Amino acid sequence: TDLHSNIHHNQMGELNQWIEHAKKTVDFWPVAYYPFYMKRTETGAGLEDLYDREQIEQDWEQLREAVKQQNEAGYPMFMGYEWQGSGDDGDHNVFFLDNEQPMLHPMRYEELYQAYKDRSAIAIPHHVAYQLGSRGKNWETHREAFSPFAEIYSSHGCSENDTGPFDMERHLHMGPRTGETCYERGLEKGYLVGMIASGDNHNVPAVHDHGTMCV
């Protein structure tokens, strides 16, 4: 499957088309709703912020109903969303085993863990090798059972280490790629953490150029 397909607020009208595409290309689909939009600071720089809460809650309920319908029809889908928090712990996609969970937006990873630790949820870090504080993975706050694997290759490039051939220069405001936060650093700290590749393309699921997850 493609474990990182972000659908935005302004794309929710295309949700049924995305689902039909997923059904043709992947065996199951964990969809990751993207509750952010790009706004401009006073200096003109781009900065991501959450949409209005009412908007994203409406989208969440629309997604919940669509996932429920597909599951009842026999196609396995799972609800999820992208969590960024303050940016100090890295971006994670949160996925749920059941279809009844709320979408929460705490600022720190530990708060996210505490909110979901008694629910059937996982939080998968991605583009982990961006610098610490700029949405790269903070291995000091990592919870192994909550985040059992990491996305190390996607449209952002390769996060396995900071010397590999696939750089991470697509989003300079999140860079540069560093050894401090890369996947290998997590292994060196003794974590048992698997690896996957995913799209992170923000258009449709299973764009295979950026890799997929084998289950």
Protein language model features and the residues they cover:
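Extended, charged catalytic domains and RNA/DNA-binding interfaces, predominantly
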Residues: 1-215
